[in-house]
Structure formats: C-alpha cells, structure tokens
C-alpha cells in the first residue's frame, strides 16, 4: 500500500470575526458567526484530526487571534500531535503574545501585509494596519520566534 491515509493539511476557518475590513477578503469576514464552534467542540475537531493522522491544521478566518480561546486551541492541537499554521493580520501580536507563541512547538505563523508602504497597505487593509503588522513582526523577532511567513496580495 502506498500514499497517504490522511490529508497532510486541513484548512479551518476558526472564526469569521475580524477587526479589519480588507478589500480583498475572501471570507467576507467581520462579525463573529453565532454558530461558531465552542472551545470544547474545537477540541473535538482536533481529536478527530489526530485520530485521522492529519499532520497540521491551517487556522484562518477572520482573525483567529480574536477568539478568546485561541491559545487554548493552539496548545490543545500541538499537544495532540496536530501542528498549527495560522494567518494573522498581526494586530493581536504584542510582546507578550509573541513570547507565548515563541514558546510553542509545531507552530508556523503567516503575517498578512499588502504593500511595501504604509499608504498602499492601509488603503487595502485600513488605517494603522501596516504599523500593526510591522510591530507584530518585530515582536516575533524579538521573542526569537524563528522564521515566519509574510503573505502579500498583489494586484495590478
């Protein structure tokens, strides 16, 4: 028998809640869905991913760090051999959050930024978003997080 018995990665829109209003948002994020999974239900999903042998989950949204239980879900996932990748606008990564993220195993972060300049980025993502994303990257670097990714949407 050859091949994989489970997907390598599963993408999970953890929340639709978002503090930005990006012009290009694919999920029409903004407000939290009232039917959003509870923490315990999220743990159940992770249990199933572990049972199936999924290598990692890509948490998106919305802004996944808006969930009050975000760190609980990430910890539960990595404690159950399900690695985590997540995309963030960076606004919730302060020095403390960066240190907490740097202390975790099996974690990959992608910070979204949409322009080489503040003017270009903020036109797409909203005022102050460029500075927030840059600050998040600085906090991650200062916390010795290691390599992280930067996601850029390019348009003509």
Indicate where each model-derived feature is located:
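Radical SAM/AdoMet-radical enzyme domain recognition
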Residues: 36-59, 67-156
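Catalytic metal- and UDP-sugar-binding loop of GT-A-like glycosyltransferases, i.e.
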Residues: 12, 59-60
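Canonical Radical SAM [4Fe-4S] cluster-binding loop centered on the CxxxCxxC motif
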Residues: 3-40
């Amino acid at each position: 028998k050859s091949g994989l018995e489970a997907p390598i990665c599963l993408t999970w829109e953890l929340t639709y809640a978002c503090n930005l209003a990006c012009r290009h948002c694919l999920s029409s994020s903004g407000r939290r869905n009232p039917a959003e999974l509870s923490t315990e239900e999220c743990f159940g999903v992770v249990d199933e991913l572990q049972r199936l042998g999924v290598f990692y989950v890509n948490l998106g949204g919305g802004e996944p760090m808006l969930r009050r239980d975000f760190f609980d879900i990430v910890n539960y996932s990595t404690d159950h051999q399900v690695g985590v990748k997540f995309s963030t606008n960076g606004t919730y990564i302060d020095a403390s959050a960066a240190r907490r993220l740097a202390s975790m195993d099996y974690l990959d972060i992608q910070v979204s930024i949409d322009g080489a300049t503040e003017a270009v980025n903020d036109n797409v993502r909203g005022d102050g978003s460029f500075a927030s994303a840059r600050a998040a990257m600085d906090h991650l670097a200062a916390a010795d997080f290691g390599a992280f990714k930067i996601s850029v949407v390019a348009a003509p």
